[in-house]
């Protein structure tokens, strides 16, 4: 049995689901899979290809209280924007920045964001 190298993460999926309307609790799921192509260390053995295996990490987060930040309330009131839409837009912006940073570190990683 040979030793293999160059196995890397090929896909990352982040899914955000609202699981409790009353308390604004969200489930954040992170799924990632390793690349199906691994290169053999020994030149005598060919490269291998196997099925991607998905792993998951689950985090439960709670939305920060809107009343705790007067500036956020003022911005929403000034623009006549719904509070939930405001937080959703801010979350999407943060996730986009997060994906850009990680893409710079791992240029071959594909990010897909799904919002439900």
From Swiss-Prot:
Source organism per UniProt: Saccharomyces cerevisiae (strain ATCC 204508 / S288c) (Baker's yeast)
Protein name (record): Putative uncharacterized protein YEL010W
């Amino acid at each position: 049995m040979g030793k293999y190298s160059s196995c890397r993460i090929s896909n990352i999926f982040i899914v955000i689901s609202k699981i409790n309307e009353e308390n604004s609790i969200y489930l954040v799921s992170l799924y990632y899979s390793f690349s199906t192509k691994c290169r053999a260390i020994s030149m005598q053995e060919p490269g291998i290809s196997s099925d991607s295996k998905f792993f998951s990490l689950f985090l439960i987060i709670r939305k920060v209280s809107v009343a705790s930040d007067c500036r956020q309330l003022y911005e929403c009131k000034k623009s006549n924007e719904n509070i939930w839409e405001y937080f959703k837009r801010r979350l999407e912006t943060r996730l986009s920045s997060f994906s850009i940073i990680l893409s710079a570190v791992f240029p071959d990683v594909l990010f897909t964001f799904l919002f439900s």
